[in-house]
C-alpha cells in the first residue's frame, strides 16, 4: 500500500489511536507506529507531543463511534475547520514522494499533523464510500478502533478473534436457554 494513499493515512490514524489510547504510549512506541506506516526521516517526539497526540486520538474516537455518515460528516467538518489548513503539496525537502498535507507546514506540531491528516483521510473515505470509514469493535471487552473500507456490510468487530468470541458467547447463551 502506498504510504501516502488515503487508505494508508486512515490505517495509520487507526493504528495511532490504538497505540495512544489502548497502550502506555511513549515517544519511542509512537515513533515505531509511525515507522511501521512508512514515515521516514527523524521522528523526534517528546512526551508532550505524545500527550497532545493522545488528546487528538480521543477526538478521533468520537468519529469512530458515529452512528451514521451524517453525524460522522458533521464531526469531520468540525475537525477540519478547527485543524486543517489549505492543502499543500510537500516532498519534505526531497525525502519522500510528493503528497498532500493539510497541516500548517512541515514543522507543524505532531498533534496538529495527526489530527488534520487523519480527519482529511477519513473525510475522503466517507465521501468515497458514503458511510463511516471506521468504527469501534462491538465486542464489549474490546472497543478498539478499526478501519472499514470494505464494499460489503459495515464491520462490527476489529478482528476475526473478537467476532468469533461474540458468536461463541451468543451460541452458548442460546444453548443454555434451551
Residue ranges and their predicted role:
Residues 169-178:
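Contiguous alpha-helical segments
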Residues 1-148:
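Short helix-coil boundary/hinge micro-motifs
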Residues 151-153, 173:
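Short, glycine/charged-enriched secondary-structure capping and boundary segments
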Residues 148, 164, 168:
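Short, non-ligating residues that shape and space the ligands of small metal-coordination modules
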Residues 133-135, 154, 166:
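A structural preference for long, well-packed, hydrophobic secondary-structure segments
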Amino acid at each position: 500500500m502506498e504510504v501516502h494513499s488515503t487508505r494508508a493515512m486512515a490505517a495509520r490514524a487507526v493504528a495511532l489511536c490504538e497505540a495512544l489510547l489502548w497502550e502506555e504510549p511513549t515517544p519511542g512506541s509512537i515513533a515505531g507506529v509511525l515507522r511501521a506506516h512508512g514515515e521516514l526521516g527523524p521522528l523526534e517526539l517528546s512526551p508532550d507531543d505524545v500527550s497532545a497526540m493522545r488528546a487528538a486520538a480521543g477526538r478521533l474516537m468520537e468519529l469512530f463511534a458515529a452512528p451514521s455518515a451524517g453525524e460522522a460528516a458533521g464531526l469531520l467538518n468540525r475537525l477540519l475547520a478547527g485543524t486543517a489548513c489549505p492543502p499543500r503539496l510537500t516532498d519534505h525537502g526531497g525525502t519522500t514522494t510528493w503528497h498532500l498535507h493539510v497541516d500548517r507546514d512541515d514543522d507543524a506540531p505532531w498533534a496538529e499533523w495527526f489530527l488534520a491528516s487523519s480527519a482529511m483521510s477519513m473525510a475522503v473515505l466517507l465521501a468515497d464510500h458514503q458511510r463511516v470509514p471506521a468504527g469501534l469493535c462491538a465486542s464489549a471487552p474490546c472497543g478498539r478502533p478499526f478501519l472499514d473500507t470494505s464494499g460489503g456490510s459495515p464491520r462490527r468487530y476489529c478482528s476475526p478473534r473478537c467476532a468469533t468470541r461474540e458468536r461463541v458467547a451468543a451460541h452458548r447463551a442460546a444453548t443454555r436457554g434451551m
